Each structure stands twice: as C-alpha cells, then as structure tokens.
Amino acid sequence: KAAFTGAEIGMLQSIREIPGFLAFTAVFVLLILKEQTFAYLSLAFLGVGVAITGYLPSVIGLYFSTFIMSVGFHYYETVKQSLSLQWFSIDEAPAMLGKLIAASSAASLVAYSFLWLAMDYVGLSYSAIYLVGGSVCLCLTLFMWLAFPRFGSNTPQRKHLLMRKRYWLYYALTFMGGARRQIFTVFAGFLMVEKFGYSVSDIAALFI
C-alpha cells in the first residue's frame, strides 16, 4: 500500500492525463503503423501497465505503471472510435455504436463484480488482482490479434488531424465529460476512502 494523500493522488492523475493530452500524436504513429496494429499494441501496453501495478507499491512505482497503462488506454480510445466507424455503414453506425457501448457497460459490471467477490469472499491480494486483470487484457489482445490479424474497412481511413468549427458542441461536451470523470471517479473515490472508510469491495459495489 502506497498510503497516498490528496497531493499524491493529484500528481498521479496529472501524470495519467499526459498521454491523454498528447493523444493527437496518434495521427503521426498511423503514418508508420496500421490502425488495427496500433490498437493491439495499445491494449498490450494497457495490460502490462495494469499487471505490474501491484508489484510497484511506491509513489514512483505507481507513477510509472500508471503512465504505461495510460499510454495504452488513451491511444486505444483514440483509434477505437475510428475503427468502429470504419466497420459500419452510415446507416447502421448509430445502432452498432449503441451495442458497443452496451457491451462496454456489461464488461464494467463484470469487472466490478469480480473486484467485489475477490476482495470480500476470496481475499485476493492487490498484486494478484492487478495481475489477473492485466493478464486477462493481454490474453484477450493476443486472441484478437490471432483471430483477426487483418480486416477490411467499409469507410476510407484518413490519417490527418481534423478539427471543424461546427463540431464545437461535441468538443465542449467531451471536455466536460472528462472533467466529470476526474471529479467522480478520482477525487470522489478518494473522498469515500479517506473520509468515510470505504474498502475496495465497498467502492466496487457502489459502482455496480
């Protein structure tokens, strides 16, 4: 246990958002790698970062593992939407994106349920939980890479940064959504642990 205070939590989240702020650099990576390959590599980074977190219970160690997993997470999030839209036609995209969001929510419920059961009933250690989570991510990434090494695209891929004034509302909502996520999932969680003594299983049950 690293025994973080609010100051360390703030620094940790600042480090976590550095790759998010620099996610636009994905357009330069795509000049070298195919988008699908980039997505697989990003997921591998995410899995490795999660897997090693439990074995680095220090301030510097958690900063390092958080940065690694954040690089994977933010780059994957950057290309995920693009890959999803390339698979579908314009007519079927809204319904299919809704199904993808539903699948993502279902996966979150499975993960939170696993945390709750692992801490309350199984008694797994932090390092074991992180190792299991990271290993599952790596195994699924390897499976997807072997099962789908290359797939076609219904929509031509653009490899340049695109910003348009008429999308300002979308940009604003995305910005506010990020702010909400920081407040709700980061500092609210820290408050529940620090001030109200919530355990890991309590936080997991709350998210469920």
Which residues fall in each region the model found?
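Transmembrane alpha-helix termini and helix-breaking/packing motifs in multi-pass membrane transporters
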Residues: 2, 24-32, 109-130, 190, ...
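Hydrophobic core of transmembrane alpha-helices in multi-pass small-molecule transporters
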Residues: 49-50, 60-76
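Glycine-rich segments within core transmembrane alpha-helices of 12-TM secondary carriers
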Residues: 95-113
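Juxtamembrane intracellular "pre-TM" segments in multi-pass secondary transporters
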Residues: 147-179
